[in-house]
Design a protein with these regions (language model features):
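Residues that cap or anchor secondary-structure elements
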Residues: 1-195
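Glycine-centered small-residue motifs that form tight turns
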Residues: 197-200
Length: 200
């Protein structure tokens, strides 16, 4: 994809910045080993962050790459979105250095991601994972292993929900000590290429 930067395994190099403000992650998923196997594309973009209905729009980020890790840092609200290859799959995490609001309204924290492309997210009944399904309803890959912890290492209750065109991560963080780390994983049996999507 023009203007994109891919987080790849075993890459080397120093930190770098992108010429265009990046906004999200595109996944190109091949569902078989053959070169002619179907390829699906899905784009994830962190769109809003906040408590209940008091959501802040999330702007494009500043890109930094370091080895197999790619980070998108946003200033307002302060959140760093990051992607890193691991044996479990592609980790898609968020680090919040401080509580988004000095006076949270007593509702859980929500991160809302816009999802577009030819794979549709469908959360399971537990709220701990979701599948990305193709037009035939087949699960092509999963978004799961959601873990959230605070500065003390304490794990926090968290769930994921899906709706038409979006995925929401909900975190109960009223007693948390920041910074906060949110860390789900894209897992698949297929080939996946990840690219950063420029802001439009």
């Amino acid at each position: 994809m023009s203007g994109s930067t891919a987080p790849r395994r075993r890459t080397r190099g120093t930190a770098s910045s992108a010429p265009s403000p990046p906004a999200g992650l595109r996944l190109d998923v091949r569902t078989g080993d053959a070169a002619h196997a179907p390829v699906h594309s899905v784009t994830w973009r962190l769109e809003r962050l906040g408590y209940g209905a008091a959501q802040q729009q999330v702007p494009a980020g500043v890109l930094k790459t370091e080895g197999a890790r790619v980070e998108l840092a946003r200033a307002t609200p302060r959140v760093t979105e990051w992607f890193q290859n691991s044996p479990a799959g592609l980790e898609h995490g968020f680090t919040l250095p401080e509580r988004p609001s000095a006076n949270p309204p007593g509702e859980p924290l929500r991160l809302v991601m816009a999802v577009t492309g030819d794979l549709v997210p469908e959360a399971d009944a537990t709220g701990q994972s979701l599948n990305l399904r193709n037009a035939a309803g087949r699960a092509v890959m999963s978004y799961a292993k959601l873990k959230v912890w605070d500065a003390t290492g304490a794990e926090l209750p968290a769930t994921m929900q899906s709706a038409a065109g979006s995925v929401t991560l909900t975190v109960s963080e009223a007693t948390a000590r920041y910074p906060l780390t949110i860390d789900p994983v894209f897992a698949q049996q297929a080939y996946v290429k990840a690219s950063v999507v420029p802001h439009k």
